[in-house]
């Protein structure tokens, strides 16, 4: 909405389906969710491998507004903790290979880490639970530490981190809109100026 066209044709505006059992766009039936959850760790790892590699193809990265939520970093954190695969650190190693590929096809990628205090996250889990959420309250501190580790190990050059403990979603978005400016491409800037001129 801010940048204006081109709007991705035939693709969702973002991809946030890298945590079981929500591994695709659109809801599954309860029976299908149960089937996904019943898969063996080996099969879950295979599905994630294929899903992540699929989302690295040219059709996604031809869209300059490509947004991946969680992606390989979420997989490296949640795989060993909740899905019983990647205990040997292999998901982190795979993540670095994925980032090397991203750097070849989209060098201007910005890695954004959203975090909050353990207390704030626990409160949000109680007040606004995800119907099929993965995170368990007793794991909050461990998960926060693991996300920090994966982001620190990332080979992606550009990073933004937001502690949302005392920020509303609107405030976080407004701050991001300011901070992303230096990372916009010339094409992004041209689109932004044209859109502002057209919409006043």
Located regions from the model:
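Residue-level recognition of beta-strand->loop/alpha-helix junctions
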Residues: 11-13, 113-115, 163
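Conserved nucleotide-binding/hydrolysis micro-motifs of P-loop NTPases
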Residues: 72-74, 116-122, 166-168
């Amino acid at each position: 909405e801010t940048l204006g066209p081109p709007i991705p044709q035939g693709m969702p505006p973002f991809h946030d389906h890298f945590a079981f059992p929500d591994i695709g766009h659109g809801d599954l039936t309860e029976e299908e969710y149960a089937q996904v959850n019943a898969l063996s760790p080996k099969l879950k790892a295979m599905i994630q491998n294929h899903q992540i590699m699929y989302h690295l193809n040219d059709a996604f990265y031809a869209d300059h507004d490509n947004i991946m939520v969680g992606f390989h970093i979420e997989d490296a954190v949640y795989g060993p903790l909740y899905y019983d695969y990647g205990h040997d650190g292999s998901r982190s190693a795979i993540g670095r290979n994925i980032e090397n590929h991203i750097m070849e096809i989209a060098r201007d990628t910005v890695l954004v880490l959203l975090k909050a205090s353990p207390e704030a996250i626990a409160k949000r889990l109680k007040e606004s639970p995800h119907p099929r959420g993965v995170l368990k309250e007793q794991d909050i501190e461990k998960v926060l530490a693991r996300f920090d580790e994966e982001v620190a190990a990332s080979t992606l050059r550009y990073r933004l981190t937001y502690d949302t403990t005392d920020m509303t979603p609107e405030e976080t978005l407004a701050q991001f809109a300011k901070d992303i400016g230096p990372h916009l491409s010339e094409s992004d800037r041209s689109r932004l100026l044209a859109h502002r001129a057209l919409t006043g």
